[in-house]
Amino acid sequence: MKFFALFIQRPVATTLLTLAITLSGIIGFSLLPVSPLPQVDYPVIMVSASMPGADPETMASSVATPLERALGRIAGVNEMTSTSSLGSTRIILQFDLNRDINGAARDVQAALNAAQSLLPSGMPSRPTYRKMNPSDAPIMIMTLTSDTFSQGQLYDYASTKLAQKIAQTEGVSDVTVGGSSLPAVRVELNPSALFNQGVSLDAVRQAISAANVRRPQGSVDAAETHWQVQANDEIKTAEGYRPLIVHYNNGSPVRLQDVANVIDSVQDVRNAGMSAGQPAVLLVISREPGANIIATVDRIRAELPALRASIPASIQLNIAQDRSPTIRASLDEVERSLVIAVALVILVVFIFLRSGRATLIPAVAVPVSLIGTFAAMYLCGFSLNNLSLMALTIATGFVVDDAIVVLENISRHLEAGVKPKVAALRGVREVGFTVLSMSISLVAVFIPLLLMAGLPGRLFREFAVTLSVAIGISLVISLTLTPMMCAWLLRSHPKGQQQRIRGFGKVLLAIQQGYGRSLNWALSHTRWVMVVLLSTIALNVWLYISIPKTFFPEQDTGRMMGFIQADQSISFQSMQQKLKDFMQIVGADPAVDSVTGFTGGSRTNSGSMFISLKPLSERQETAQQVITRLRGKLAKEPGANLFLSSVQDIRVGGRHSNAAYQFTLLADDLAALREWEPKVRAALAKLPQLADVNSDQQDKGAEMALTYDRETMARLGIDVSEANALLNNAFGQRQISTIYQPLNQYKVVMEVAPEYTQDVSSLDKMFVINSNGQSIPLSYFAKWQPANAPLAVNHQGLSAASTISFNLPDGGSLSEATAAVERAMTELGVPSTVRGAFAGTAQVFQETLKSQLWLIMAAIATVYIVLGILYESYVHPLTILSTLPSAGVGALLALELFDAPFSLIALIGIMLLIGIVKKNAIMMVDFALDAQRNGNISAREAIFQASLLRFRPIIMTTLAALFGALPLVLSSGDGAELRQPLGITIVGGLVVSQLLTLYTTPVIYLYFDRLRNRFSKQPLMKLE
C-alpha cells in the first residue's frame, strides 16, 4: 500500500524516473548496431594447404589425412570435413558453439605444427588457417573491369591497393579477391625445341631459379664513406628472362627464348571472373562479427571516390552486390509495423474508455516501455534486427496489458464516484498482484528458451531477453507511472463524456449480457464444455503431427547464389563458355538486376554466380518463384547444370554444397561409397519433395594414367623422381622462382606452352635426360591410357564421405523432404557399412524438431511452477493453464489456412501464446478467489461474477495483443516472410482461445473447486 502511495504522492519523482528510462533508451537506440538477424558466431576454422600439380587422391592421402589425424584430437570439434582437389586441400573444423574461437585457433596452430613433419617436402608453403563464420554472407561485392588492363593487372590493383584500403574500413573483417590471380612471368616451354637442343625441363628450372635470387650483398666501410653493395641478382620482367642462358650445346649458348615463349601473364591461367558480360576481378567484402552492416556499407561507399582515385581512370570499380538495401527495407517495414501496432493498441484503449485523458496514460506507458528496452539491448550487446524489432512489435500488445488492467480498474472506481487519488490507490492495490502474476508468468515462458542450447537458443535469445525486458519495464511503469497519471489526470463522474461512454457502453453491455447468459448455460452443462476442451487437446496433437514443418521461413533477401557443375572431363576453356552462357540466361530474366560469376581454381568443372534481384517493388515474383521460372531455361544447356538457391541470413555448417540442404553418406570403404552414392542420388532425384538433387562425388574425371616400366628405367639410368619432376615441370604450372617488388611478391611459373597442355598427345614429346646425357623420350619407359579419376576426394572425420545436396520445390517443406529421404534410404536397403545422415541446416532442423515438444512442455512446466508459487496452490495454475489447448488449435489452424509451414518463428509464436492467453484466466481466477475469500459466496457465483466483472479488461487486453500482432500478419515487402508466421500464429491463437477460454476457464475452475472440497474442507487461504 505504501509502495503505491509513494509514487502517487510524488508525481515529480515519478515523472523524472520515467524521463530517465526514456532518455537511456534513446541513447541506447543510437548506439545499437544493425543486422538482419542476431549475430550467431560459429566457431569455424578453415585450414588450407596446397601442393600445385598434385592430384586429388595424392592430396587426400599425403596432406589431408595427416592433418585430419592431428586436428581430430582437438577438444570441442563437432564436425571435421575435408575436400581435396587438384593441388589443394581444405579442411573445415566446426567447434561447439560454446568454444572460444581464439582458443580453438591456438589449438589448430599447435596441431598444424605437430603435423608438419608428416607432410610432403614438396609443399611450397606450410598449411594456413583462418577463422570464418559460415552464416555471415558478404556485405558487398565489387568488380574491377577494364578495356586496357589485363586480368592480372586488375587483380594486382585489387589485392595490392583496394583490398588493403577497404580492409581498414571500420566494420570490415576480410576482403577476398577472386576472378583471376596475381601477375607472373610465365615460361611456356617448347618440348620439341628442348629436345633438339638437348636441354631438359629440369635444367631450365634450375637455370631460372639460379638466375633470380635475392640475397644480401653486405656493405663496405671506406675511410670516409659507408658503401652498400647491391648487385643485379634479380630479373623482374619477361623481357629480362628471355636472353637468359639455360644451356650450352657444343659450345653455343642456348637462351631461354630459343626454347620457350616468355610472357608477362598471371600465376594461374585457369581462373576467370565475369561481370556484365565482360572479364572482371571480384572483391568480396565481409564484416566483423557484430558490426553494423548498414554503417559499414555506408563507410565503404563513402570511400569509393578515394578508391577510384587510387587506380587508373581506365579501370572501372563498380558495386555488383550490396546487402544493405534489403536490410534497410526489412527493418523499415518492421519499424513501420511497430508504429502501426502502437497506434492500433492505443486506438483500442480509446474505443473502450472513450476518454482522451484516459487514453493518454497507455499512450505514454507503451512508448516508454518500448524505448527503455533499447538501453537494455545495448548493455546486453544486442543489435537492431528483424527478431529484436519483432519482439518489440509483439511487446506492444503485452506492455499495454498491464496499463489497461490498472487503468480499467481505477476507471471502474472513478465511475463509482470515488475521488481520483483514492481510486488510483485502491485500484492499483486490487490488481497489483494480478499484474505481477501476469508479467512474471509471461517472462517465465522464455526461461526454457534462454537455456536452450544450439543455434535456436542463440538465435532467439535476443528475442526472449528483449521481450522480457520490455515486460519488466512495463510492470514498473504500470505500478508507478500509470496510477500516478490516473490520480492527477482523471476525474470522477466526467459528465462531459457521460453520454459518449453510455453510448458505447450500451454495445459493450449488450455483449456482456449475452456472454453472461451463455456462460450461465456453460456452467450448467459443464460436461459439454469439457468435451470441447478435451477435443481441442486431441486436435492439437493431430494438427501438430500433420502440419508441414521447416527450420526457418524461406527468406527473400533479394540475392541468389548459383553453382555450376559441368561434365567432369570438361576443359577450362569450355567451362568459361558455360559460365558466360549461364550468366546470359540468368541476366535476361526481368527480375534480375545484376550477375557476377567466376570459375577455375582447383575445380575446373565448377563455377559460382552472385545474383542480385531487383527490389521487391520492381518485381512481381519472389526469389523462389524466379528460381522455378529459370529452371526450365537452364535445363536446356547441355553438359552442365546450374543450381540456384536464394541466399538466406541463416546458414549452418562450413561445407560447400550446390544447394541449401545436405545429406551425407559415410563409409570406411571408398569402393562401397562409390557404389551406393549414385544409387542413393538417383533415388532422391525421383522424389517430388526434393529439387536440384546433386552430389559432390566426382570420380569420373578424365585421367591419363601412366604406368612406369621400372626395369627399363633402371637400365636407362632414370629414377621415378626424375620422371615425376618432368611431368610436374611440364603440366603443373610450377612456381619456380619469386620476384620481389616494393608492394607485393610475384612468381615465375613454368609449364609447356598452351598448345601442349591442351592436347594429351603432348606426352609423346616429353623426354628425360639421363645420367649419360642421353635424351630419353617418355614413351620409352612409360605407357599411358585414358582412365577415370576423382576430381575431388571428400572426408568427414576420417571416413570417406559424399554429400548429396538438394533444394525444396516451390511450396515444399523440409519435414516432408527429410521424411522422404529417410523412406528412400530404407527402401533401397543401403548396407550398414554405408551410413547416411543429414548435415548443415537439415541436421539442425532434425535436432530442433526432436526438442520442440520438450521446449513447449518445459515452458508450460515453468509457468506452472511460477503460478504455483504465486498462488500457493497446486490446482489454480492448472485452471489458468487450461487456456493453452485452444490457443494451440487456433495457431495451427491459422498456419494451415495461410499455407504456412510450422517453423522456428511459429514455435516462438506458440511460446508467446502460452504467456498471452493465460492472462484472461489469471484475471478471472484472481477476482474469483478474492470473492470467495472475502465475500463468502460459492465457487460458481464467484467465477460467474469474476468473468462478468473482468469481461471488459479481458476483451481490451486480448484486442490489444491481437492488434499488436495484426501488422505482422498484414505486412508485405522485405522480410515479410519472417514476420507473417509469428503474427499468424498469435492472431489465430488469440481468436480461438478468446472464444473458448471465456467458457472453459470458469468450468475448469468449478471442477477443481469440487475436487478441492472433496479432499480438503479447509477454506481458501487469504494471500496478503
From Swiss-Prot:
It is found in: Cell inner membrane. Signal peptide: none annotated. The keyword Calcium does not apply. It is a multi-pass membrane protein. GO terms for molecular function: xenobiotic transmembrane transporter activity. InterPro entries: AcrB_DN_DC_subdom, Acrflvin-R, Multidrug-R_MdtC. Disulfide bonds: none annotated. The keyword Transport applies. GO terms for cellular component: plasma membrane. Keywords: Cell inner membrane, Cell membrane, Membrane, Transmembrane, Transmembrane helix, Transport. Gene3D superfamilies: Multidrug efflux transporter AcrB pore domain, Multidrug efflux transporter AcrB pore domain like, Multidrug efflux transporter AcrB TolC docking domain, DN and DC subdomains, Multidrug efflux transporter AcrB transmembrane domain. The chain crosses the membrane at residues 12-32, 333-353, 360-380, 387-407, 435-455, 469-489, 528-548, 853-873, 875-895, 897-917, 953-973, 984-1004. Part of a tripartite efflux system composed of MdtA, MdtB and MdtC. MdtC forms a heteromultimer with MdtB. Belongs to the resistance-nodulation-cell division (RND) (TC 2.A.6) family. MdtC subfamily. This is Multidrug resistance protein MdtC. It comes from Yersinia pestis bv. Antiqua (strain Angola).
